């Protein structure tokens, strides 16, 4: 037994300068696990509740002292003396203590920080890397897989102050032989893109996730400048590198219309499906996240019927890492992949359940950061520990993003060739 001796929390800052919760779980052996909760900008309406203070005299109302108090009080009282190795029992105890469907009682940010800190403490107690401990919790056996990164090198939407409607334009170095080489390819393309933008007299400032955020005439132009950057870096688009989008469509969906204000165009669901299909015909786009609004299930059905056999269709705001909603998607053949974000559901155990349900149904699971991140690198270990095969953790700058990539480099080196880099085979519809 790895007895929990103490738990305490602290209000710290995330990468956007907003408060978040950091928790420490201390074991009787003296081992300490520390974790921070991330925070999103474009959020699904069904996500677990992030508890904020609402006190406008502090941090513009975004303080998390209530969540910190929940950790230092009720959560600590409930978990001290329990076994950190029994992750599911710890998470269940916190969910019972919270007593709500959306974690409004204690706050998903409070519960998650403790859940992850406990897992880290347990891994240290066992003397194994965190990814190995997560693999044990998940029931993962056999060869590990390193994740193919979705690198968000050009930002729009809620992640940038520009006129581009689609939120993320990403590259996937599928032709690389290893994660290390994939990271190198991505970095070289990132630097090439900066030169391409500068040559056009466009902004090379970056958005929340480290991607460039220039004003462009259309979403298609964003893809065109990325293609130019890929070629400038010496790679072949569609062979060495493929493209992925996060439309974050809920951010521009209103009254049944998809409004691309940057292009001055508006589409109904059928029209927007055709718009996305046309982009896929023009460019090697192999993955689209949140192609339709989170409430537009009919639109999602049409998108899946149109593109689902050849494009990975990832539900983020649609599924919010929630097994109940994911099951509906599986049953109704909506999408074919789920984005996994710890804080959408609020505990490690529930996150693992969502990955398991997806993989058992033949869906892929893409492990993801949030736009508001910290130096915490747990998602890197989660991606390897569950052999998810894909990770989305931003661009090739900003230390809150690069920290995850650097952690994956360490993991790959530790595994010394025991972990395969799956390339295109990791992406639904491409293997």
UniProtKB/Swiss-Prot annotation:
Location of this chain's protein in the cell: Cytoplasm; Secreted; Cell surface
Superkingdom, natural source: Bacteria
Residues annotated for (2R)-2-phosphoglycerate binding in this entry: 167, 341, 370-371, 392
Sequence positions that bind Mg(2+): 246, 289, 316
GO BP field: glycolytic process
Catalytic residues as annotated in Swiss-Prot or TrEMBL: 209 (proton donor), 341 (proton acceptor)
NCBIfam families assigned to the protein according to its UniProt record, in alphabetical order: eno
Subunit structure, as described in the record: Component of the RNA degradosome, a multiprotein complex involved in RNA processing and mRNA degradation.
The protein, known as: Enolase
Species assigned in the record: Chromohalobacter salexigens (strain ATCC BAA-138 / DSM 3043 / CIP 106854 / NCIMB 13768 / 1H11)
Gene name, Swiss-Prot/TrEMBL: eno
């Amino acid at each position: 037994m790895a007895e929990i001796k103490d738990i305490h929390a602290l209000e710290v800052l995330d990468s956007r300068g907003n408060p978040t919760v950091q928790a420490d779980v201390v074991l009787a052996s003296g081992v300490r696990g520390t974790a921070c909760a991330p925070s999103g900008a474009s959020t699904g309406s069904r996500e677990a509740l992030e508890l904020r203070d609402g006190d406008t005299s502090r941090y513009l109302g975004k303080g998390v002292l209530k969540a910190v108090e929940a950790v230092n009080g009720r959560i600590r009282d409930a978990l001290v003396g329990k076994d950190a190795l029994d992750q599911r029992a710890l998470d269940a105890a916190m969910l019972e203590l919270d007593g709500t469907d959306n974690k409004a009682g204690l706050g998903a940010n409070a519960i998650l920080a403790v859940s992850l800190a406990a897992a880290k403490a347990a891994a240290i107690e066992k003397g194994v890397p965190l990814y190995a401990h997560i693999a044990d919790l998940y029931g993962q056996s056999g060869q590990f897989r390193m994740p193919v990164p979705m690198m968000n090198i050009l930002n729009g939407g809620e992640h940038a102050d520009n006129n581009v409607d689609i939120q993320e334009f990403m590259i996937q170095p599928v032709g690389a032989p290893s994660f290390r080489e994939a990271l190198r390819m991505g970095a070289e393309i990132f630097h090439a893109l900066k030169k391409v933008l500068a040559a056009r007299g466009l902004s090379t400032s970056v958005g929340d996730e480290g991607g460039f955020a220039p004003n462009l005439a259309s979403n298609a132009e964003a893809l065109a400048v990325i293609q130019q950057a890929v070629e400038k870096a010496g790679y072949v688009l569609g062979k060495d590198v493929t493209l992925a989008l996060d439309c974050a469509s809920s951010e521009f969906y209103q009254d049944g219309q998809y409004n691309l204000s940057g292009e001055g165009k508006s589409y109904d669901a059928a029209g927007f499906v055709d718009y996305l299909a046309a982009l896929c015909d023009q460019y090697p786009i192999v993955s689209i996240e949140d192609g339709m609004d989170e409430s537009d299930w009919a639109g999602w059905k049409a998108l899946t019927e149109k593109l689902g056999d050849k494009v990975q269709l990832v539900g983020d705001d649609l599924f919010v890492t929630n097994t109940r909603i994911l099951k509906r998607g599986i049953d109704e053949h909506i999408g074919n992949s789920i984005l996994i974000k710890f804080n959408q559901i609020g505990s490690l155990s529930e996150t693992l359940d969502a990955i398991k349900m997806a993989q058992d149904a033949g869906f892929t699971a893409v492990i993801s950061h949030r736009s508001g991140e910290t130096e915490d690198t747990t998602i890197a270990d989660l991606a390897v520990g569950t052999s998810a095969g894909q990770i989305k953790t931003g661009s090739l700058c900003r230390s809150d993003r690069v920290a995850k990539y650097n952690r994956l480099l360490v993991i790959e080196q530790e595994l010394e060739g025991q972990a395969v880099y799956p390339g295109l085979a990791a992406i639904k519809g491409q293997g």
